[in-house]
């Protein structure tokens, strides 16, 4: 495939079967636990055509080689396992709570040590990365929406020998390519925007370093953290429409952010697309769009925020994101969420519905819950 194609074209055409007479236009799931001897697969845990197609597509979008996993957390666990026993990871203070919980568990078990900092504080992170084995970046962060200076942090990681990992779930490969910004590894919860329909659980890791790719693929193979063929195929099918879905969802998010900024019950809107947002300048520098996730705060009233989530009719009160339907939740309803996330913070994962309908439902909930 030509290297000068727009990512919105690559996402449609990458990973398809060779165009020969009578070949299928698209890849199909292969339901087999083993293969006839003589090839490089040998067993179902070693490869599947549906994985290969998804990995090839994600690899072309991110600029590396992909490895898919049974879930985003399986991908996280495989990457963290690259850190030697007794090693140290520098991680964000705010990030997906499942990742932070896993790091805490490994630290408590004596497997490694973890330093958690404000990932938007570049100077502090650069100082902390000296002597670290891995720097874990999430940008924008979940759910605080902080934006890291990926090029500066990646450069610091290279200088000190730390492996730099970027969780690109919120931005997707269409809005941000961390490998081109200097990262060593990029990972996704492909459950979210990649698959895009809230019907499959998947993870993915992409790297341009052959040694890292081999080490990560070996961990997937050894741990058995493989995606099922149907799940991989659903992920690929969803990925084909990412450009269209993201364009609409991002437009909706920007529309809602502006409306919410003026609402009397909303004390803060966290969205890097807003010119006054602390992460706006960085987002402009390293992203081609601001994404479809935003968070709002409601004057410190956690009970009110919870009632808002329970009063919506169109917005789904659920804990995921990246699907075609809009979802919202108060993140502190989860005991696992870090205590520095405000009690009244609601994360809005914006879908592809008509923006006027989304706003009317949200505005009604803000009023009804009072």
PLM regions: where:
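Short conserved active-site loop signatures built around small residues
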Residues: 1-30
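Structural preference for beta-strand elements that scaffold enzyme active sites
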Residues: 134, 163, 185, 268, ...
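Conserved N-terminal alpha-helix of the aminotransferase class I/II PLP-enzyme fold
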Residues: 27-30, 34-82, 98-107
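PLP-dependent enzyme catalytic core of the Aspartate aminotransferase-like
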Residues: 150, 245, 310, 326-370
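Conserved PLP-enzyme active-site core in the AAT-like
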Residues: 2, 67-263
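Conserved small-domain helix->loop->beta segment predominantly found in fold-type I
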Residues: 254-313, 332-340
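A common structural junction motif
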Residues: 223-224, 311-322, 365-370
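Short, well-ordered beta-strand elements within core beta-sheets of diverse protein domains
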Residues: 235-244, 291-299, 346-351
């Amino acid at each position: 495939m030509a290297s000068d194609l727009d990512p919105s074209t690559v996402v449609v055409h990458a990973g398809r079967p060779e165009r020969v007479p009578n070949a299928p236009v698209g890849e199909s799931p292969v339901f087999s636990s083993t293969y006839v001897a003589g090839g490089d697969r040998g067993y179902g845990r070693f490869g599947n055509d549906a994985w290969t197609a998804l990995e090839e597509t994600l690899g072309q979008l991110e600029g590396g080689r992909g490895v898919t996993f049974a879930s985003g957390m399986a991908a996280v666990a495989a990457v963290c396992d690259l850190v030697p026993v007794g090693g140290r990871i520098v991680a964000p203070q705010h990030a997906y709570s499942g990742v932070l919980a896993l790091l805490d568990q490994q630290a408590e078990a004596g497997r490694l040590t973890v330093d958690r900092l404000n990932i938007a504080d570049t100077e502090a992170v650069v100082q902390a990365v000296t002597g670290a084995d891995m720097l874990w970046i999430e940008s924008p962060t979940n759910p605080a929406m902080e934006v890291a200076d990926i090029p500066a942090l990646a450069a610091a990681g290279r200088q000190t020998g730390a492996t730099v990992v970027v969780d690109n779930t919120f931005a997707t490969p269409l809005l941000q390519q961390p490998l081109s910004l200097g990262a060593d590894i990029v990972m996704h919860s492909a459950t979210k925007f990649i698959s895009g329909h809230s019907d499959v659980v998947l993870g993915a890791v992409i790297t341009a370093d052959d040694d890292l790719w081999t080490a990560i693929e070996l961990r997937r193979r050894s741990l058995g953290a493989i995606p099922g063929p149907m799940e991989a195929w659903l992920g690929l099918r969803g990925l084909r429409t990412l450009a269209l879905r993201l364009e609409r969802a991002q437009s909706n998010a920007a529309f809602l952010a502006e409306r919410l900024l003026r609402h009397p019950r909303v004390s803060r809107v966290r969205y890097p697309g807003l010119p006054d947002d602390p992460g706006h300048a960085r987002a402009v520098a390293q992203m081609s769009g601001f994404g479809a996730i935003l968070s709002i705060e409601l004057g410190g009233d956690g009970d009110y925020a919870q009632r808002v989530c329970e009063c919506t009719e169109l917005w789904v009160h659920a804990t995921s994101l990246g699907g075609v339907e809009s979802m919202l939740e108060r993140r502190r309803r989860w005991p696992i969420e870090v205590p520095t996330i405000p009690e009244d913070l609601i994360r809005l994962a914006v879908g592809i519905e008509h923006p006027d309908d989304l706003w009317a439902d949200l505005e009604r909930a803000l009023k009804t819950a009072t």
